[in-house]
């Protein structure tokens, strides 16, 4: 056998080994993302109250506040049940916003107010309040929305985290790229997510906080969103009254919200 043969043989062996390692890494990344998703939201229809407050950098008192009543119909496929991802967002506070409703069906989003004749499509990236966009108040399933790659391990506060790179699977997804930090030990609790634009500019950072036992798992009941582009102003999303609730499917339709969802 000549040297050229050995060269080709080692090249093939290296390529095969690399492919196996990459597949193994991606499978591990997928499992981490899946476990973290289970912490962020249950795989059953549920309802919660979301209080959003807006702060200037360094401030301790909010300058703006909004309260939303949200029903989520998110389910991964199990047995004869198909996957579903819909939500109903009712505006509660301030009083001037009562009667306004947002409806999402996978990655489509509509807004309705009694002044409109019919629901109108809106962007998930459109600002709702402070650093919070329309899409932020609706739980995103990272496993379905992004391809994930495990980049390694890093320190996060006093703990060790997996660092994962997420790249959106479709242009329908709000954020093209996310760097996601998930605790290595325990249930793989989410720690932080950094959201990037198409040209790799860091837009905002999300910190998961105040973990409490809710619906069978320890879940983050507070999320702080910091706008790194505009002086580190930040907004806080606080979750309360989280409970399982399965509304009829027709509640998650444009026809229903036009009649005034309850």
Region locations from a protein language model:
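N-terminal, post-signal-peptide region of Sec/Tat-exported proteins
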Residues: 48-82
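Flexible, processing/modification-adjacent segments and terminal tails
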Residues: 23-45, 51-52, 60-64, 95-176, ...
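Functional cores of ribonucleases/endoribonucleases
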Residues: 70-103
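Gly/Pro-enriched, hydrophobic low-complexity segments
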Residues: 108, 118-122, 137, 159-254
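Edge/loop elements at the starts and ends of beta-strands within beta-rich repeat scaffolds
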Residues: 37-46, 80-82, 213-217
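Sec-dependent signal peptide recognition
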Residues: 2-12
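Hydrophobic h-region of N-terminal signal peptides that target proteins for export
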Residues: 12-21
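Extended lipid/amphipathic-ligand handling interfaces
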Residues: 36-37, 69-78, 208-213
